[in-house]
Amino acid sequence: MEKVTNDTIKHVAALAQLEFSEEELAKFTPQMGKILEMAEELQAVDTTGVEETVQVVDRDTVFREDVPEKWQTREEMMKNVPDKSNGFVKVPVIIDKDDNQ
């Protein structure tokens, strides 16, 4: 396994659009290294003959029927929106488009 470095954490943080201080990087880098070491140990476990688990919760544990309810009017909702334009909710850009793509 590759050693986890500050650059590794910075790269993953950038992908998740997170920013960390140098103190946080110094703290998170060894923690992430330990987590990945544990995951590597799990990969070594022999699971031959073990049935795959796709859901750990019983599917019959529904507490109520999923019935849509009228929550509030559009106007009431728009009163709570911090940034709007022409009656639409404005949200920050999360995907940068490159002209070369």
UniProtKB/Swiss-Prot annotation:
EC identifiers of the protein: 6.3.5.-
In which domain of life is the source organism classified?
Bacteria
Q: Which residues cross the membrane?
A: none
One MF term in GO for this entry?
A: glutaminyl-tRNA synthase (glutamine-hydrolyzing) activity
GO BP terms: namely: glutaminyl-tRNAGln biosynthesis via transamidation; regulation of translational fidelity; translation
What range does the record give for the signal peptide?
none
Q: Which UniProt keywords apply?
A: ATP-binding, Ligase, Nucleotide-binding, Protein biosynthesis
**InterPro entries assigned:** Asp/Glu-ADT_sf_sub_c, GatC
Known catalytic reactions: L-glutamyl-tRNA(Gln) + L-glutamine + ATP + H2O = L-glutaminyl-tRNA(Gln) + L-glutamate + ADP + phosphate + H(+); L-aspartyl-tRNA(Asn) + L-glutamine + ATP + H2O = L-asparaginyl-tRNA(Asn) + L-glutamate + ADP + phosphate + 2 H(+)
The record's subunit annotation is: Heterotrimer of A, B and C subunits.
Q: What does this protein do?
A: Allows the formation of correctly charged Asn-tRNA(Asn) or Gln-tRNA(Gln) through the transamidation of misacylated Asp-tRNA(Asn) or Glu-tRNA(Gln) in organisms which lack either or both of asparaginyl-tRNA or glutaminyl-tRNA synthetases. The reaction takes place in the presence of glutamine and ATP through an activated phospho-Asp-tRNA(Asn) or phospho-Glu-tRNA(Gln).
PANTHER family listed in its UniProt record: GLUTAMYL-TRNA(GLN) AMIDOTRANSFERASE SUBUNIT C, MITOCHONDRIAL
Membership in a protein family:
Belongs to the GatC family.
* NCBIfam families associated with the record: gatC
Name of the protein described by the UniProt record: Aspartyl/glutamyl-tRNA(Asn/Gln) amidotransferase subunit C
Origin species: Lactobacillus delbrueckii subsp. bulgaricus (strain ATCC 11842 / DSM 20081 / BCRC 10696 / JCM 1002 / NBRC 13953 / NCIMB 11778 / NCTC 12712 / WDCM 00102 / Lb 14)
